[in-house]
Structure formats: structure tokens, C-alpha cells
């Protein structure tokens, strides 16, 4: 069985979430040669649906930085979650540092009710849930924190790694996220 796995942002996608015609033709050639194609991304399954329409295929999906894996038929064959107790502790630490979070479980997008979500339009396929307190959030697939100051995020990542690295994968994917 042959597989080609590709990252999404910055690899398959150009700016503005557009897939080039060249990329579409290349993937189509692979599929016609019976090569299994997979997309690996930090996005959730709902966050890649528009891109799949551009490609015109239903590939394997490795989503949420590996927390979820879906078959071409859409069946979830891996669903790794951060347990609720750990989620609560991590979110409290984030809030203690005066930062906001975006948290994801399947099609649900959680955020603090105190947070103004100006960019929710970029997540139209997710069900938005504004939570009163961190204890109200269930097990999660992924938590995102972003800030314009990379130093703030590096400090937070170090704090979270010291407290939770044995319980959850903690990483800085970009200077501001």
C-alpha cells in the first residue's frame, strides 16, 4: 500500500487557502495511480472541508496535529483527547496569564464567554460554545493560545511543559500561536 501524506498550510495551500491547479492535477494523478493520499494538518476535520471541495477528493485526514484520524469515508479511527481534569488545569493556567484560548472537540469550538470572538467567521462549520468557566469544558482534542508577543507565548509554553508535558503534547507551532 502506497501513501503520500502532505501538510496543508504552506504546502498544499497558497495564500488565502487556495489550492493551485498544478497541485490539483498532481494529486489527481496520484489517486488515478491508486496511491492513497492523506492530508496532515493542525486543523480540525470541519476546517478542511472547503479545501477538500477544491481538491475534489476525500482523502485520509490526520487532523488536530494527529489527535484525530479519519478514513476517506469520514470515519474517525483515532480520537485522542486531553482529559477534562487536565483541560481545566491547562485553561486555568492560560487565563492566569491573561491569555485567551480556542479549544476544540470534534465539531465544537469552545472559548471563554468573556472573550470577543471576532474571527469566528473563519470557523463557520464549527459549533461555537461560549463557556462560563473552564470546568464546563469537556475532554478536548486541541487547545490553541495566540498572542502578538512571542515572548509571552514562549513563557506560557515553558510553564505548561513543566506542569503538563507528561500528560499532553505542548508545542509552539508559530511565533504567535
Where are the model-predicted features located?
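Active-site phosphate-binding/coordination module
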Residues: 16-117
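Extreme N-terminal starter segment of soluble prokaryotic enzymes
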Residues: 1-5
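Conserved residues at the C-terminal ends of beta-strands
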Residues: 7, 64, 146
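Conserved acidic, metal-coordinating active-site core of Asp-based
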Residues: 93, 97-99, 104-177
Amino acid at each position: 500500500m502506497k501513501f503520500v501524506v502532505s501538510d496543508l498550510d504552506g504546502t498544499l495551500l497558497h495564500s488565502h487557502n487556495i489550492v493551485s491547479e498544478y497541485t490539483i492535477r498532481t494529486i489527481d494523478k496520484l489517486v488515478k495511480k491508486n496511491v492513497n493520499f492523506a492530508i496532515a494538518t493542525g486543523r480540525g476535520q470541519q476546517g478542511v472541508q472547503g479545501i477538500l471541495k477544491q481538491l475534489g477528493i476525500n482523502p485520509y485526514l490526520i487532523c488536530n496535529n494527529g489527535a484525530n484520524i479519519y478514513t476517506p469515508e469520514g470515519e474517525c479511527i483515532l480520537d485522542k483527547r486531553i482529559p477534562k481534569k487536565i483541560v481545566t488545569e491547562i485553561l486555568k493556567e492560560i487565563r492566569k496569564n491573561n491569555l485567551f484560548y480556542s479549544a476544540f472537540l470534534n465539531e465544537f469550538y469552545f472559548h471563554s464567554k468573556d472573550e470577543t470572538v471576532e474571527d469566528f467567521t473563519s470557523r463557520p462549520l464549527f459549533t461555537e460554545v461560549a463557556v462560563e468557566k473552564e470546568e464546563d469544558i469537556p475532554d478536548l482534542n486541541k487547545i490553541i493560545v495566540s498572542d502578538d508577543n512571542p515572548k509571552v507565548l514562549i513563557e506560557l509554553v515553558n510553564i505548561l511543559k513543566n506542569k503538563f508535558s507528561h500528560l499532553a503534547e505542548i508545542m509552539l507551532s508559530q511565533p504567535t500561536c
